[in-house]
C-alpha cells in the first residue's frame, strides 16, 4: 500500500498565505530546494486542490519555472498529477488527471496500487478535507520563522484532529519541519 502525505508551509502563527494570498514570505534556499527535490523523488503521484494546481501549473512548465530550479521543475513536470476540483473542467498541465466527483474513493483506490508515495504539496483545503477520512498517513508541516498576523489559516475548516509527532528537522534558514501522523478514531 502506498503512503499518502501532505506537505505544507506555514508561518509561525499558523497561516499558509498572507491576506493577498502571496507566498513571498516562504523561507526557501538551497537546503530547502534539496529537501523539496528529495521529497518529489519519493512521489509516484502528486495531488493538488484546484487553487494550488493553478499556481503550480502556471509556473513549473514555463521557462521561468524551469530556470528557477531545473531539477525540481523536471520532477514536477514528469510526475503524474491529479487535481481534485468540482469546478475545473480540464487540466492543461501535461500528465494531469482531473477528479471532480468521488475523490475520497479514487484516492483510496490509488493508495492500494503499488508504487511510490502520493504527495500533496500545498493544498491546505484539500488536506483539511482528507484529515477525517483516514487516508492521510503523514503531515509534513514546515514552519517558517515569520509572523504574518493575518491571512489564510493552515487548517481552516478542519475538524479537530490529534497528531503524533514522528520527527523534526531543523534547517539553517530557521525553518523547522514537523512530521506528524494524524490519529483517526
Per-region residue spans from a language model:
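Enzymes that bind and transform nitrogen-containing heteroaromatic metabolites
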Residues: 1-185
